[in-house]
Amino acid sequence: MKSQRMKGQETELSKAQSQESASLGTRFLVMGSLNYDYIYSLDHIVEPGETIASVKLDKACGGKGFNQAAALAKAGAKVYLAGLVGSDGGELLETAQEFGVDCRLVQERDNRTGHAIIQVDKNGQNSIVLYGGTNRMWTAEYIDSVLDSFEKGDVLILQNEINGIEDILEKAYARGISIVLNPSPFEACILSWQLEKVSLFFINEVEGSQMTQKSEPKDILDQMLFQYPDAAVVLTLGEKGAWYADREERYFCPAQKVQAVDTTAAGDTFTGYFLMAQEKGFSAEQCLSIAAQASAIAVSRKGASVSVPVWAELQMDL
């Protein structure tokens, strides 16, 4: 894998993507993180000052960008992943490609690939510590090289595990690309970004509270739509369900009851399946139901991207 993509290769890629755009539906571009996940199975999440032994250690491919791209691909979308890895990132690319993700935009940098230390307790709840690595090495030049291959009608999915998000928002919006933002992990600086450029927000209850200074789901949705009236909002509440809201409609979908084994990829699975259901023409209410079902399947399995179901596993009784 080369650290720099040649100009001729970029032209060839752009031409190939233009042909695909003409023959397929919406193209999804995920600009995000690629991590190696080190997953420690524990009786409980470690407390400050406590030392405990893990029951098991697993290594998996992850990162919010990787997981959302995997979820979209497993749902049947045409998805491109842009991100940065180190010389140790080969396994991430191989795994993503096996899922059906186009990784031609991923480049290599002189640093370690990002990783995450994930604690998973006996109830399937998790706690995550991130190391950014190459995920924090995005430049304006790389951002331009990625976005130059996309145009109006394409959909961009962003999270907050990479740097350069402000630049990406501005440049993607100028190209007419529809922007989806999952502001996770949340940082106060997010509120200073030009978030009016976002078409669809995916937030959980904690992120929603941080974004709006509200605590109740109804109040969070009201405030988000007041602040960003041209956007739609999906608010996930874990085992309590999820809301969809825009300025014309609002729907709630209860979560499906399952025995949670690992919740690591729950949110990313929900995001990917909601977007693909939307692409297939389902109503917002149906998209919530489809995403909830996919997320329920994912949390009933160990691992992150490997736990994401394929579309055929869902029961379409809507």
Name every feature range the model reports, one short phrase each.
Residues P48-H115, D317-L318:
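Substrate-binding N-lobe of the ribokinase-like
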Residues A70, H115-Q119, S127, G241-Y244:
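Short beta-strand scaffold segments in enzyme catalytic cores
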Residues S33, G83-S87, E108, V120-K122, ...:
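Cofactor-binding loop segments of dinucleotide-utilizing enzymes, especially the Rossmann-like FAD-
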Residues V155-D219, Q223, G241-A242:
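Conserved beta-alpha-beta core of the PfkB/ribokinase-like small-molecule kinase fold
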Residues K2-F28, A188, P217-L318:
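Conserved phosphate-binding/catalytic region of the ribokinase-like
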Residues I45-S54, F202-N204, F252-C253:
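Short glycine/proline- and charge-enriched loop/turn segments
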Residues V106-E108, I118-V155:
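Conserved phosphate-binding/catalytic loop of the ribokinase/pfkB sugar-kinase fold
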